[in-house]
């Protein structure tokens, strides 16, 4: 960044305008609320690889309370499951809620930065979002007393 750009970035910190972006040939800076997010320009994440394990529901099964693991009723899912970045207008029913919520509203409520929003993935069964990856499962696919088969999904990490 040159001196003029640095002054502009500094000036943006004293204004109430969030979402301002600054670019060089290699870098991008985003002013989001009271933070500056810096990212290499054009850097794109690879589509995450899913690890899926189907298990029978037994009395000893304990539902993992971990947002990094989706725990879904396997009998309610339409295969194949797909993974993609969320799109404008996408909706899901966050676990524990009854009504649909726009993914964009959910991410805003959780105070995701613009960079984080741009890199958020969803797992879909048919047209339905069943998991906002590493955030929240869809309530309609939750484990209930009548669930017999459970599908556990997580994102493959390096070395897994």
Report each predicted region and the residues it spans.
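AMP-forming adenylation/ATP pyrophosphatase catalytic core
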Residues: 1-160
């Amino acid at each position: 960044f040159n001196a003029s750009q640095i002054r502009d970035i500094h000036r943006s910190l004293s204004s109430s305008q969030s979402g301002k972006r600054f670019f060089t040939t290699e870098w991008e800076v985003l002013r989001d609320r009271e933070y500056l997010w810096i990212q290499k320009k054009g850097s794109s994440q690879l589509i995450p690889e899913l690890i899926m394990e189907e298990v029978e529901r037994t009395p000893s099964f304990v539902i993992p309370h971990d947002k990094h693991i989706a725990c879904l009723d396997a009998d309610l899912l339409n295969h194949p499951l797909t993974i993609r970045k969320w799109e404008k207008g996408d909706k899901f029913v966050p676990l524990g809620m009854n009504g649909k919520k726009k993914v964009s509203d959910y991410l805003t409520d959780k105070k995701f930065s613009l960079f984080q929003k741009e890199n958020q993935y969803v797992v879909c069964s048919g047209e339905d979002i069943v998991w906002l990856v590493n955030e929240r499962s869809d309530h309609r696919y939750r484990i209930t007393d009548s669930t017999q088969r459970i599908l556990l999904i997580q994102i493959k990490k390096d070395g897994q």
